Design a protein with these regions (language model features):
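Short, solvent-exposed polar/charged micro-motifs at secondary-structure junctions
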Residues: 10, 131-133
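Conserved short loop/turn motifs at secondary-structure junctions
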Residues: 96
């Protein structure tokens, strides 16, 4: 486990089996270091070359002006982490409950635009979703 950057603290996890890896980092604010949290580079190293990264992507950049220090990330920061860590697939997670499905789809489209030309698959997680590694 790895400490996450959140006011209530917590842990992120990396699971590896049969040559596949899954990293789970929810409630993790990448651009603000809460007590007990780590530096961006530590999360990058933890997620390095993962087959799947599930990361907190609650906010839009404009939301973050009002929510900085709340313990959640802007979706574009999650994409940057996935790209910097060489992750194969990024699942956006912990969507803002006020965000419409269409708005989440727009976030995914933007993630794909940001990652264009690089080997990163972006998608939004939803309730009851199952993912094969």
């Amino acid at each position: 486990p790895i400490p996450i950057s959140h006011p209530n603290q917590g842990r992120g996890y990396r699971f590896e089996e049969e040559g596949r890896s899954f990293v789970f980092l929810t409630d993790n604010e990448l651009t603000y270091r809460h007590p007990g949290g780590l530096e961006y580079e530590d999360y990058q190293t933890f997620a390095e070359n993962a087959d799947l990264l599930v990361h907190d992507a609650e906010y839009l950049p404009e939301d973050y002006l009002l929510t900085r220090t709340w313990g959640h990330s802007v979706y574009t920061d999650a994409v940057r982490l996935a790209l910097d860590a060489g992750v194969a697939r990024l699942g956006l997670f912990h969507h803002n409950q006020d965000r419409t499905d269409e708005a989440v789809d727009g976030m995914v489209d933007d993630c794909r635009r940001i990652a264009a030309g690089r080997p990163l698959e972006c998608f939004a997680l939803h309730q009851d979703m199952e993912i094969a590694l």
